[in-house]
Amino acid sequence: MDFGIGFLSNNVMLPIIDFFYSVVPSYGLAIVALTLIIRFALYPLSAGQIRNMRKMRIVQPLMQKRMAEIKERYKDDPQKQQEEMMNVQKEFGNPLAGCLPLLLQMPVLLALFATLRGSPFAGVNYSVNLQIFPSEQIERIQPQAFATPPQNIYIADGEHTKVTAILPGGNKLAVGEKTKIQYQTLEGKPFPVLLAEHPESKLSPEWKITKGEDRIKIDAEGNIEALQPGDVTIQGTIPGLAADKGFLFIDALGRVGAIDPDNTIHWDIVGMIVFFGISLYVSQMLSGQNSSGGNPQQDTVNKITPVIFSGMFLFFPLPAGVLMYMVIGNVFQTLQTYILSREPLPEEIQKIVETQEKQAVAEQKTLPFEPKSSKKKTTG
């Protein structure tokens, strides 16, 4: 039984989407509601991560200084050096402690991501691998039914079921042999029967040969004919029920990519990518990641990171619904970072901040050409 991302998607994410769609029939609002619910549920974990990052950003200079002193002091005694370093980590905290909340969040966030990349928001792909043998070897082929892993498909609003692609005679064919790829539920109900029960749903499967185009022929109904020996891969796609539905300024929740092959620009997707980059930059500023400590190279890296990360969506496009989720999630995290950055620091951390501020003021008061120690008075 699957208790991973698929379990979370089917038993947590999709029921939430179905509930909100039943209240307000808008898949766009359902995405917004689902994103906010998951983000609020993960708030304590992400808050712990943000607090730890804020703390480590403050204590890191002092911690590094102490570590360097220990390495120099006990360079001839590795055991004592290790012991003292562990004491420093106990005093200031382990820098890796903030990774645990992130690791705990990852399965939930990946399940949310996977949910928005599947039905009903996007087309679901099935990969059928075939082996074609010469016709004289047909006696060696043992018929054995072939089925792809089942995937969740929305047949109608609020109604979804597991659907698999099958080849009753198996995926090993002889040249000249004909067969048909069929979709059906786990209970064996044919996909056309499901569609007949919901005539309002226009879900016409599509077929594409991704490997071995010269070895096989396939029509719109999934009928195939083996032409030449070799390996073949056919990709079947069941369209997403809500893929062509819009929300606010978004034309289609399932649209993938900011630019079509005919060079048509989709400004709704471009706008979300730009806004995501801006929110990422603001989040970096609030979390202090843009404080490079006077290192110009690191400062440059921090500034261009949001540009690079956002620009990736132009080359590795995602469905508009997934982009909307990422924008909402990032804005939520930015607001959370802002709120937590206004929290009072623990007393011991506040003392470190005050000490650092005093040192900074003292360094500013000392001019570069002045000696750090007072000059001895000369007697004439």
Curated annotation (Swiss-Prot):
Membrane topology: Multi-pass membrane protein
UniProt KW Methyltransferase keyword: no
Primary localisation category: membrane
Region (Disordered): 361-380
Organism superkingdom: Bacteria
Cellular component per GO, a single term: plasma membrane
GO biological process: protein insertion into membrane; protein transport
Chain's role: Required for the insertion and/or proper folding and/or complex formation of integral membrane proteins into the membrane. Involved in integration of membrane proteins that insert both dependently and independently of the Sec translocase complex, as well as at least some lipoproteins. Aids folding of multispanning membrane proteins. Probably also aids protein insertion, folding and/or assembly of membrane complexes destined for the thylakoid.
Official protein name in the record: Membrane protein insertase YidC
